[in-house]
Amino acid sequence: MKICIVYGHHNTKSSFNAAIRDTFIEEASLCGHQIDLINLFDEEVQLPFYNSDINPPPQIVLDYRKRLENSDVMFLIGSCHNLRMPTILENWIDWVLHPKWFFSYRALVPGSKYFKNYGYPVPGAMNGKLGLISMTYGGPMVTYFNFSLFDNIPYRRIKKAVMNLGGMVTKYIRFYSV
């Protein structure tokens, strides 16, 4: 199995996230899996801030998509800051996991001028692949939960609003204070 890891933590050497990444790579390699690591802070070419007016997307976006297409698993690793993943990882998601490649919309009533903006998502290039999320929180669990419908907003947003749109099967690994 080929696993594409997208690592988005600023401390690429000695953080808890780096330990998760390195341990995962070591264990997965021992099991015979191939690893394709995208270390966003160490990439030679950095993505510009997302701008929908840039069309077609930069070549690096197409390269990332090709790497994902050649993988069986996408594994996002990052920390939680202000109830979001790091900006560099969010920007990567905005560019790479974008509609028409990652998912598209199908109209409820095709050809209707009245319902042309109403529809449902149709998974794209990553449909059926496994999506793993590792998010570290740096504090006790209770500080990120309010025991309501909106518990764990960062995870819900990535899982439901990103990976589910793309038709991915998801697994979530969370770490609080250690």
Task: Please tell me what each predicted stretch does.
Residues 2, 34-36, 130-131, 168-169:
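Residues at the starts of beta-strands that form the adenosine-phosphate
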Residues 6-8, 38, 134-136:
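Short hydrophobic segments within beta-strands
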Residues 9-11, 138-142, 177-178:
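A short, flexible beta-alpha/helix-coil linker loop
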Residues 33-45, 173-176:
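A short beta-strand-loop structural module common to alpha/beta enzyme folds
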Residues 39-58:
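N-terminal beta-loop-helix "entrance" segment that forms/cooperates
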Residues 56-156:
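Helix-loop-strand module that forms the ligand-binding subsite of alpha/beta enzymes
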